[in-house]
Amino acid sequence: GTRIKGVDVPTTLTTPEAPTLQALFARMAREGVTHVVMEVSSHALMLGRVGGTLFDAAGFTNLSQDHLDFHPTMEDYFEAKALFFDPASPLHAEHSVICVDDEWGERMARVARNPVTVGTRGQAGVDVAATQLGADDSGAQEVELVLGDATYEFTLPLPGAFNVANAALAVALAAEVGVDPEAFISGLSEASVPGRMQRIDRGQDFV
């Protein structure tokens, strides 16, 4: 779905078809929206849904076997995603932020031009490093994030190591487009994704 200034707008695809997407952008502009955050699927990149849309920054989290019904191989899937990061592609974003926690991320960082790199596994040389310091019974995690010369500690209510990587990437993307990291991080304490790793508590003695 889509949300514009707190109002839910029903949409069905991860990335809407081009006419719908541009209509949404036009509505946002009329309503005074200045920034858009969206998920761009490999389908959208391959099928022209974001053609003519200029992106300030793009983030790459990871690559897994999610869409092999559409892509015949992982290599084809990677090449589709690379359209968003390769400076030779007409679809590439102005800035790239890439999580290098796996081989696909490391490879994408080599494709992109001057990417900001994010790591959660203690890698040397990354631009943004995140570490889980601990977690409570609800799954909420204490996270330390090093960005440039600054170190931040915050509570992330979303469980799972992948959400530490997602949060670090989001902070790095926000910083790349001029958002104050401290202000952005303060909002992570209220982050939730309904239906995704959502805790259900009905009084049971298990999570």
Name each model feature, range by range.
Residues 44-51:
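Conserved helix/coil segment N-terminal to the catalytic DExD/H
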